[in-house]
Amino acid sequence: MGFFSSLSSLFGLGKKDVNIVVVGLDNSGKTTILNQLKTPETRSQQIVPTVGHVVTNFSTQNLSFHAFDMAGQMKYRSTWESYFHSSQGVIFVLDSSDRLRMELLKDELMMVMEHKDVVSRGIPIVILANKMDIPGAMTASDITVALGLNLYRSGTWSIHSTCALTGDGLDKAMQQLSAEITKYMESRRT
């Protein structure tokens, strides 16, 4: 098996390693989402708030992800940008039931979407409108309008409704992110 894995890697047929940054305000569900993306036997039983950052590894069909789960508390948000230069993708997680912090959320999301490393390198961004299971949560369409994303034409981004606790919506979002990262990596080779 090791021989075939080595041979696959040599010819570019194996899974590609990619770095992604996972950001969003505190208590949006970033760590819970990453926990859902791991294999069942490697999932944590207890989720605690992230301090600084934690690296989580998981795979999709064609990519091996090294996800930098960044703390969302205000004192840590300034550290997010130092990870963009070495990333091939960004996941921005938001709590779709947190209507009180929509303006703050918009500011932080725009900081990410307009960051020089994200823009100049064309890094794809997947926005996860999490906690859709909570009564009164905003829909992805409502969030798109509330954050002004319907007017945002530059960059590669998409928004997906998710529920971190059940995993609903995560497969589709990760398929989208994987496809966008694959396109991004291919465009960087030419």
From Swiss-Prot:
Keywords assigned by UniProt, alphabetized: Cytoplasm, GTP-binding, Lipoprotein, Myristate, Nucleotide-binding
Molecular function as annotated in GO: GTP binding; GTPase activity
N-myristoyl glycine: lipidated positions: 2
Compartments reported by the entry: Cytoplasm
Binding of GTP, residues: 24-31, 69-73, 130-133
This protein's record includes keyword Plastid: no
Gene3D superfamilies membership: P-loop containing nucleotide triphosphate hydrolases
Tissue expression as described in the entry: Specifically expressed in ciliated cells.
Gene Ontology biological-process entries: cilium assembly; intracellular protein transport; intracellular transport; PERK-mediated unfolded protein response; protein localization to cilium; vesicle-mediated transport
CDD domains for the chain: Arl6
A single Gene Ontology CC term: axoneme
One Pfam family cited in the UniProt record for this chain: Arf
InterPro entries with a match to the protein in the record: Arl6 (IPR041839), P-loop_NTPase (IPR027417), Small_GTP-bd (IPR005225), Small_GTPase_ARF (IPR024156), Small_GTPase_ARF/SAR (IPR006689)
Family listed: Belongs to the small GTPase superfamily. Arf family.
NCBIfam families: small_GTP
Name assigned to this protein: ADP-ribosylation factor-like protein 6
Organism: Caenorhabditis elegans
Organism lineage string: Eukaryota, Metazoa, Ecdysozoa, Nematoda, Chromadorea
Gene from which this protein is expressed: arl-6
